[in-house]
Amino acid sequence: MRAVPWKPVALITTTISILLLLLLLPACCCLRKGMPALKLPEPPPSRIPEIGASDIPTPTEAQAHAPTEAMMRNVDFHIDATTVLHIHSLRGQFVAKQPGAPVNFDNKTQFVVKIDRAKIGMDSAGLDQLMNRYVFGYPGAPLRDLHVVPEGKQIVQSGIMHKGVDIPFTMYGDVSATKDGRIRIHPTKLQICSINGLGLLKALGLSMEKMLDLSKAKGVVAEQNDLLLEPTKILPPPQIDAHLVEVHVEGGELMQVFDAGMHLPELTLPYPNEKNVMYYRHGTLRMGKLLMVDADMEVTDTDPRDPFDFFIDRYNDQLAAGWEHNTPVYGLMVFMRDYQDLGLPAQPGERLRP
């Protein structure tokens, strides 16, 4: 009896299977060239005010001799006009990049936020804009029109994968923190129309790592089928220095827990009953023409019913719309209007200028 040439037969069978799979994909109308891109509202360009860009000498007596200690609670911190980090709690330090320089609120490119510990969430809208504007916001990106929804214990991400042609996809993924402080998104299900995308990739001997060219992406790499994101590198200025220890879905947000192990002591607020607050202590702060030496400034919003909506690019507008007073120990208590309330009539229950 003549031996059957199994290896050639297996090779031919595999090749035919791959060709059939490639033919089936267009048949399900999932591969279409030239699909229109999802139009997200563009934020106004981030600007550094003239006073922040100009060279204003710092008097010797105002040079910073220590970092500015910081804490935040219930703050919606804008990284642009519409993308928000929900800071539930934060303890850290603001440090100027130039030794001895003050922390300049008018130039967020010139200081670093060193987070000791924090709990920070992002909702679906924020995740959409973060991924589309900052991670994959460049021409020819392999992923676009991304929509991310925290659901149950997973995130559901849909969008367009471009590999020669546009491939609409929906991916269900588990989230976890790696030992080196990155967010791991591990797909448990990948849908391309009615086709099992993970099974398809396996049949073709492919993976997300092989499919996606992420060389130009910001703060993300692929490892097999997992995506690894560096939370401190995917954000625009100010620069963040932090270590992620946990990530999970909570209350409709992708919740990130940071702990750098600095064990900074708790700060004592001058007015501890404020629900939504930022507090800055020690070091030197610059805000426009004002230099605050050995800073002691508590900042809250005029409307305490919801989180403090703060945008550092527009801090002076928020300050001008609010009010402040000195404390008995020469500190400042500042009441700012929420960024989203600028230009609107006073809200019911809002604390107005005395």
Q: Where would I find each of the regions flagged by the language model?
A:
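Short hydrophobic alpha-helical membrane-anchoring segments
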Residues: 20-30
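Extracellular/lumenal and peripheral-membrane lipid-interaction modules
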Residues: 29-354
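N-terminal Sec-pathway targeting helices
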Residues: 2-20
